[in-house]
Amino acid sequence: MAFNKLSIENLDLAGKRVLMRVDFNVPIKEGKITSNQRIVAALDSIKLALSKKAKSVVLMSHLGRPDGNKNIKYTLAPVAAELKTLLGQDVIFLSDCVGSEVEAACKDPAPGSVILLENVRFYVEEEGKGLDASGGKVKADPAKVKEFRASLAKLGDVYVNDAFGTAHRAHSSMMGDGFEQRAAGLLLNKELKYFSQALDKPPNPFLAILGGAKVADKIQLIENLLDKVNEMIIGGGMAFTFLKVLNNMKIGGSLFDEEGSKIVEKLVEKAKKNNVQLHLPVDFVCGDKFAENAAVSEATVEAGIPDGHMGLDVGPKTRELFAAPIARAKLIVWNGPPGVFEFPNFANGTKSIMDGVVAATKNGTVSIIGGGDTASCCAKWNTEALVSHVSTGGGASLELLEGKTLPGVAALTSA
């Protein structure tokens, strides 16, 4: 996929209305935002547009899954209030995202206006599908999708996309239909910069650290990365499927992925063919149940895990074993924790990898943390500033690493 896209930095925005797709899909409990991280992440692009004397910045985003219905539970109103505080200037919140009233409000706003539209997913035309009032599946009428996109296009003169978290979706607000110039915002740009380092011409040694539960979910990721990396660490629930197939290990009640097990040997074959060193755990920290208060025991690959116990983290020997490839890597991509880091007794494996990645970064290694759970690990241990890049998109970063084209990126104007 081509990563070289037109950037907001290279646009002349003076006197222009900027329609910007952002990712304000923040967690909200009882009308209160519990983490404003995604709003903070969009501030740089908004401020840059304003400093370039844009007439207005019109922001559009989704929140949650209203499935094409106007569900007040998913209103962006609390986001408008938070954005006003963070920006230190007034934010005009519109109670819709398309239609004549919205078009009128965005036609000739006061210079320097920041306008936030209501949730784009209140319309089935955003995702192209949704649910009707009785919960039945509905598909959007293509003519109405065209109309929806045309109404959005009337709200700005230039289109900027800064929503990497949704870049793997070909949704209406992500495509910039009707705009001559479609540019990447600063956040999206940063994501592309780091992922192009990993996927275009990576330095050696390039290490991938992969965790997560199912091999089947990560087949494409492993396949694609085996063509690029020099070493690969496999941890998490996924490791048990590998070890049962390869070593006939007794895994007790640990996760086993029947579907994924069929492809393990093929993946190992590919690793050998490509000269990729695979690192699998040699010991585990186990629990008698999947719970924070589980009784803790240890097990090795040779001895196996007894019935009634499950592996929930990698053990001390494995932590030592994994430290060496991390220390020698020039580039690290990490997607998925090696253990159940949410439970303190089973967090040491993930913490030791995190410590290793932070130390390597300090020594000049480029470290890229895939979104989702791995990004949560960085938040948990306050290491966001101690690694090179924490991705804002779990699904989008995964699809990029799988070698897929992201529609939201492909739609942007080439640089």
Swiss-Prot record:
InterPro entries, per the entry: Phosphoglycerate_kinase, Phosphoglycerate_kinase_CS, Phosphoglycerate_kinase_N, Phosphoglycerate_kinase_sf
Binding-site list for CDP: G212, D217, G236, G336, F341
EC number(s) stated in the UniProt entry for this protein: 2.7.2.3
Keywords: ATP-binding, Cytoplasm, Glycolysis, Kinase, Magnesium, Metal-binding, Nucleotide-binding, Transferase
Biological processes per GO annotation: canonical glycolysis; chemical synaptic transmission; gluconeogenesis; glycolytic process; muscle cell cellular homeostasis
Presence of keyword Disulfide bond: no
Binding site for AMP: A213, K214, K218, G237, G311, E342
Residues holding ADP: G212, G236, F341
Residues noted as binding (2R)-3-phosphoglycerate in the record, renumbered to the chain: V22, D23, F24, N25, Q37, R38, S61, H62, G64, R65, R121, H168, R169
Cited Pfam families: PGK
Catalytic activity: (2R)-3-phosphoglycerate + ATP = (2R)-3-phospho-glyceroyl phosphate + ADP
Phenotype when the gene is knocked out: RNAi-mediated knockdown is lethal. Glial-specific RNAi-mediated knockdown is viable but eclosed adults present with locomotor defects. Neuronal-specific RNAi-mediated knockdown is viable with no defects. Conditional RNAi-mediated knockdown in adult glial cells results in reduced lifespan due to neurodegeneration. Conditional RNAi-mediated knockdown in adult neuronal cells has no effect on lifespan.
Pathway(s) this gene product operates in, as recorded in its UniProt entry: Carbohydrate degradation; glycolysis; pyruvate from D-glyceraldehyde 3-phosphate: step 2/5
Cofactor names: Mg(2+)
Record HAMAP family: Phosphoglyc_kinase
Record function comment: Enzyme of the glycolytic pathway. Glycolysis is essential in glial cells but not in neurons; neurons rely on the citric acid cycle for their energy needs, and on lactate and alanine secreted into the hemolymph by glial cells to fuel it.
The family this protein is said to belong to: Belongs to the phosphoglycerate kinase family.
PANTHER family: PHOSPHOGLYCERATE KINASE (PTHR11406:SF0)
Protein name as it appears in the record: Phosphoglycerate kinase
Organism: Drosophila melanogaster (Fruit fly)
Source organism phylogeny: Eukaryota, Metazoa, Ecdysozoa, Arthropoda, Hexapoda
